[in-house]
Protein backbone atom coordinates (compact mmCIF):
# COMPACT_ATOMS: atom_id res chain seq x y z
CA UNK A 1 0.00 0.00 0.00
CA UNK A 2 2.90 2.22 0.72
CA UNK A 3 4.19 1.80 -2.78
CA UNK A 4 0.76 2.99 -4.11
CA UNK A 5 1.17 6.20 -2.10
CA UNK A 6 4.64 6.70 -3.54
CA UNK A 7 3.36 6.18 -7.06
CA UNK A 8 0.48 8.61 -6.46
CA UNK A 9 2.81 11.18 -4.88
CA UNK A 10 5.22 10.73 -7.80
CA UNK A 11 2.43 11.35 -10.30
CA UNK A 12 1.34 14.48 -8.45
CA UNK A 13 4.90 15.77 -8.43
CA UNK A 14 5.20 15.13 -12.19
CA UNK A 15 1.79 16.63 -13.12
CA UNK A 16 1.88 19.63 -10.73
CA UNK A 17 4.61 21.53 -12.60
CA UNK A 18 2.74 20.99 -15.88
CA UNK A 19 -0.36 22.72 -14.53
CA UNK A 20 1.76 25.69 -13.46
CA UNK A 21 2.78 26.21 -17.12
CA UNK A 22 -0.68 25.71 -18.68
CA UNK A 23 -1.69 28.24 -21.36
CA UNK A 24 -3.88 31.18 -20.46
CA UNK A 25 -6.67 32.16 -22.86
CA UNK A 26 -8.48 35.32 -23.91
CA UNK A 27 -11.35 35.70 -26.32
CA UNK A 28 -11.93 38.16 -29.13
CA UNK A 29 -15.39 39.01 -30.38
CA UNK A 30 -15.37 40.08 -34.02
CA UNK A 31 -18.32 42.19 -35.15
CA UNK A 32 -19.28 43.42 -38.59
CA UNK A 33 -22.12 45.48 -40.03
CA UNK A 34 -22.85 45.26 -43.73
CA UNK A 35 -23.35 48.76 -45.12
CA UNK A 36 -26.86 49.36 -46.39
CA UNK A 37 -27.12 52.34 -48.75
CA UNK A 38 -30.65 53.63 -49.23
CA UNK A 39 -32.54 56.87 -49.79
CA UNK A 40 -36.23 57.72 -49.51
CA UNK A 41 -38.19 60.75 -50.70
CA UNK A 42 -41.51 62.09 -49.45
CA UNK A 43 -43.66 63.03 -51.17
CA UNK A 44 -42.48 61.52 -54.43
CA UNK A 45 -44.32 64.00 -56.67
CA UNK A 46 -44.56 67.76 -56.98
CA UNK A 47 -47.00 69.62 -59.25
CA UNK A 48 -46.05 73.14 -60.35
CA UNK A 49 -49.49 73.51 -61.93
CA UNK A 50 -49.78 76.03 -64.77
CA UNK A 51 -46.68 78.12 -65.51
CA UNK A 52 -46.21 80.88 -68.04
CA UNK A 53 -43.70 80.59 -70.90
CA UNK A 54 -40.24 82.06 -70.27
CA UNK A 55 -40.75 82.31 -66.49
CA UNK A 56 -39.23 80.71 -63.42
CA UNK A 57 -41.45 79.24 -60.72
CA UNK A 58 -40.22 78.16 -57.28
CA UNK A 59 -41.92 75.28 -55.45
CA UNK A 60 -44.11 76.18 -52.50
CA UNK A 61 -43.34 72.97 -50.60
CA UNK A 62 -40.30 70.77 -50.29
CA UNK A 63 -39.47 67.13 -50.85
CA UNK A 64 -37.95 65.42 -47.80
CA UNK A 65 -34.88 63.40 -48.77
CA UNK A 66 -34.02 60.87 -46.05
CA UNK A 67 -30.99 58.65 -45.63
CA UNK A 68 -32.77 55.47 -44.60
CA UNK A 69 -29.60 53.41 -44.86
CA UNK A 70 -27.46 52.45 -41.89
CA UNK A 71 -24.41 54.63 -42.59
CA UNK A 72 -23.56 58.17 -43.64
CA UNK A 73 -24.34 58.83 -47.31
CA UNK A 74 -23.70 61.24 -50.18
CA UNK A 75 -26.48 62.08 -52.64
CA UNK A 76 -26.50 62.88 -56.35
CA UNK A 77 -29.29 64.27 -58.56
CA UNK A 78 -30.09 63.64 -62.21
CA UNK A 79 -33.06 64.04 -64.52
CA UNK A 80 -33.62 60.48 -65.73
CA UNK A 81 -36.76 61.05 -67.77
CA UNK A 82 -37.89 64.29 -69.34
CA UNK A 83 -40.66 65.39 -71.67
CA UNK A 84 -40.15 63.97 -75.17
CA UNK A 85 -40.79 67.32 -76.85
CA UNK A 86 -38.35 69.29 -74.66
CA UNK A 87 -34.63 69.28 -73.97
CA UNK A 88 -32.92 70.29 -70.75
CA UNK A 89 -31.07 73.61 -70.82
CA UNK A 90 -27.91 72.72 -68.85
CA UNK A 91 -26.09 76.01 -69.32
CA UNK A 92 -26.57 79.33 -67.58
CA UNK A 93 -28.75 80.53 -70.48
CA UNK A 94 -32.49 80.86 -70.05
CA UNK A 95 -34.53 78.09 -71.69
CA UNK A 96 -35.40 78.72 -75.33
CA UNK A 97 -38.12 77.20 -77.47
CA UNK A 98 -38.87 73.60 -76.43
CA UNK A 99 -36.24 73.80 -73.66
CA UNK A 100 -36.69 73.74 -69.90
CA UNK A 101 -34.54 74.02 -66.83
CA UNK A 102 -35.06 72.35 -63.47
CA UNK A 103 -33.09 73.67 -60.54
CA UNK A 104 -32.83 72.27 -57.02
CA UNK A 105 -31.74 73.60 -53.66
CA UNK A 106 -31.33 71.88 -50.29
CA UNK A 107 -32.54 74.35 -47.69
CA UNK A 108 -34.29 74.03 -44.33
CA UNK A 109 -36.96 76.59 -45.29
CA UNK A 110 -38.49 77.86 -48.52
CA UNK A 111 -35.63 79.48 -50.45
CA UNK A 112 -37.56 82.55 -51.55
CA UNK A 113 -35.14 85.11 -52.98
CA UNK A 114 -32.15 82.74 -52.81
CA UNK A 115 -33.15 81.66 -56.31
CA UNK A 116 -33.39 85.20 -57.69
CA UNK A 117 -30.80 85.51 -60.42
CA UNK A 118 -29.95 81.82 -60.39
CA UNK A 119 -30.55 81.71 -64.09
CA UNK A 120 -28.56 82.88 -65.84
CA UNK A 121 -26.42 84.96 -63.45
CA UNK A 122 -25.24 82.28 -61.02
CA UNK A 123 -24.06 79.65 -63.49
CA UNK A 124 -25.03 75.99 -63.47
CA UNK A 125 -24.52 74.93 -59.83
CA UNK A 126 -28.19 74.34 -59.08
CA UNK A 127 -29.30 73.02 -62.47
CA UNK A 128 -30.23 69.33 -62.48
CA UNK A 129 -28.59 67.78 -65.52
CA UNK A 130 -29.97 65.03 -67.71
CA UNK A 131 -26.57 64.29 -69.22
CA UNK A 132 -24.94 63.27 -65.92
CA UNK A 133 -25.43 62.91 -62.18
CA UNK A 134 -24.32 65.88 -60.11
CA UNK A 135 -22.95 65.70 -56.57
CA UNK A 136 -25.15 67.32 -53.93
CA UNK A 137 -22.22 69.00 -52.23
CA UNK A 138 -21.36 72.45 -50.88
CA UNK A 139 -21.20 73.78 -54.46
CA UNK A 140 -24.14 72.09 -56.17
CA UNK A 141 -27.69 72.45 -54.87
CA UNK A 142 -26.61 73.84 -51.51
CA UNK A 143 -28.51 76.41 -49.48
CA UNK A 144 -28.17 75.95 -45.73
CA UNK A 145 -28.11 72.16 -46.32
CA UNK A 146 -26.43 69.85 -48.80
CA UNK A 147 -26.39 66.17 -49.69
CA UNK A 148 -22.83 65.51 -48.55
CA UNK A 149 -22.29 63.27 -45.50
CA UNK A 150 -25.96 62.92 -44.58
CA UNK A 151 -26.13 60.79 -41.40
CA UNK A 152 -28.26 57.67 -41.13
CA UNK A 153 -31.90 58.70 -40.54
CA UNK A 154 -30.98 62.28 -41.49
CA UNK A 155 -33.48 64.25 -43.58
CA UNK A 156 -32.75 67.25 -45.78
CA UNK A 157 -35.24 69.46 -47.61
CA UNK A 158 -35.18 69.64 -51.42
CA UNK A 159 -36.79 72.60 -53.19
CA UNK A 160 -37.34 72.79 -56.96
CA UNK A 161 -37.43 75.73 -59.34
CA UNK A 162 -38.74 75.29 -62.87
CA UNK A 163 -37.67 77.35 -65.86
CA UNK A 164 -40.34 77.12 -68.56
CA UNK A 165 -39.68 77.03 -72.30
CA UNK A 166 -39.85 80.39 -74.04
CA UNK A 167 -42.35 78.72 -76.36
CA UNK A 168 -43.69 75.21 -76.83
CA UNK A 169 -46.16 73.15 -78.80
CA UNK A 170 -46.63 70.80 -75.81
CA UNK A 171 -49.64 72.28 -74.03
CA UNK A 172 -50.62 69.23 -71.97
CA UNK A 173 -49.09 68.32 -68.61
CA UNK A 174 -45.44 67.25 -68.87
CA UNK A 175 -43.55 65.00 -66.43
CA UNK A 176 -39.93 65.15 -65.35
CA UNK A 177 -38.41 62.32 -63.32
CA UNK A 178 -35.57 63.31 -60.99
CA UNK A 179 -33.53 60.47 -59.51
CA UNK A 180 -31.84 60.89 -56.14
CA UNK A 181 -28.98 58.40 -55.88
CA UNK A 182 -27.30 57.49 -52.60
CA UNK A 183 -23.64 56.52 -52.24
CA UNK A 184 -21.38 55.75 -49.31
CA UNK A 185 -20.11 58.98 -47.78
CA UNK A 186 -16.68 58.74 -49.36
CA UNK A 187 -18.13 59.24 -52.87
CA UNK A 188 -17.15 62.92 -52.92
Residue spans for each PLM region:
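Signature of Gram-negative chaperone-usher
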Residues: 23-188
Amino acid sequence: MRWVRFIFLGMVLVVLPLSLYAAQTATITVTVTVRYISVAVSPNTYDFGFVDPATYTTATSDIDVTNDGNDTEDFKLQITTGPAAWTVEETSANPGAEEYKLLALFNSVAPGDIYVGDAPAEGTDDIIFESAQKNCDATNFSGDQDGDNVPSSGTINLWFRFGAPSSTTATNQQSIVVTVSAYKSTEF
